Amino acid sequence: MKRFIIKGPNKAIKGEVNISGAKNSCLPLMAASILFKNKVILKNVPFVKDVLTMKDLLVSLGAEVDISEKKKMMTITNKKNHKLVVPYNLVSTMRAGVLTMGSLLARYPQKKIKVALGGGCALGVRDTSWHLAGFKSLGVNNSLNKGYVNISSKNGLIGSKYKFPKVTVTGTSNLIMASVFVKGTHYIKNISIEPEVIDLINFLNNSGTDIKFLGKRSIKIKGVKELVNGIHTIIGDRIEAFSYLCVGAITNGKIKINNIDPTNLRSEIGILKKIGYKIESNDNSIKLISSKKLKPIKLKTGPFPNFATDNMPLILAVLTTIQGKSQIEETIFSNRYMAAPELNRMGAKIIIKKNKATIIGQKKLNSADCISSDLRTTFSIILGAIAANGSSKISRIYHGLRGYYNLE
C-alpha cells in the first residue's frame, strides 16, 4: 500500500469503534517476555506493523512466538538462552527495540549485550543517555561502537538509587525491567506514569515482581529470583481512541469508542469539552456528540496526566476547522509539528514558532496531495482530508500502519 486517496468532505460520521490493544503497551510487554523462563501469553494484542517487527526481533533472539490474529493473542516461549545481539535491521524502523536492553540485562547481567540504536518516528532528540545512566546506577558499564550500545556488569546488578532528569517513558520501562532481579532494592524517582507504564508494572507484579509506589513518581523495586504466570490482557489504545474521537469531531458527527478507560484520556476529554463537544463516558467507553457552538482553545502537551504529545497532531487538524485563534505549546518533542505544512497545503492557517503553534481556524479545507512523515502525522493528514473539499492523495501511508490496525 503506497497511498490513500480520500474524497471529502465527509458528512457527519456516526457509529461505534472497538479500540485495539495499546501498541505502546504491547511493545514493552513483549520486551518483558525475555525476563521469563516459561511462557508469556498476551491478550488483546494489536497486530500492527511495529508489533510484528517486535515479534521478528524476539524470534531472532531465540524465542518462539505463536500468534492468533483472530483471538488477538500472542504466546511467547523461551525454551533456551537468548542471543545477545539485537540487530539494526529489526530496530531501524521501531524505537521500541531499545526496550530489550533492560530485559536482556536482567536475564544476563554478566554477559556482553549489543543493542543497535533504533528508529521510529523522526520527532527530535530521543537518545538513550538516560536509559544508560539508569543502568549505570545498577552497576552496568556501557560503550558505543558502530551504532551499537554494548552493555554488561561484571558483578551483576545491585540495587541503589536513580532519579531521571526528565520524565521518559521508554527510559522508565527499560530501567524497571532491568531492576526486577537486582540484588537488594532499587529506588527510582521521577518516573513516567503513563497508562502503558502502569500496565507494564501491573503485568510484572502479577507475575511475581515486588514493585511499590513510594509517591506519585517514585517506586522501589525489590529484586526477586524469577517470574511466573506471564498472562496479561493489554489495555485499550488511548491514542487510537482519541484518533477516532477526532474523526467524529472534525466531521461534526457522533461517535462512540469502546474498550477504553476514559481516565486515560482525562486531559483530552477536558479539551474536547472546552471546545464545545458533548462527551459521555462510562468505565469502558466514550461518546462524542458534536455541537454547533465550537470555540478555539489553548493547550499544552506534557507527561501524563497532561495532554499527550501523540494526540497533539490529531487535535491540531480538528482546530484548523474551528473558527478563531487556537494555540498549542508542545513540550515533549522538537519536531512534533510535521503535520502543519501538510495541513497548510489544504488551506489551513497554522503558524509555527519554535515549540508553539497558532491556528487560525476556518470552516473549510481544500484537497491536496500530501506526504506523511510519521505515525501520528499520517492520521492528522487523514483527518484533514476527510474534512476537505475534493480528493486528497496521501503518500507514504506505511507510517500509519505502524500504529493503526486495519487503517484502510
Residues of each region from the PLM?
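Short, structured segments at the rim of ligand-binding sites
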Residues: 1-408
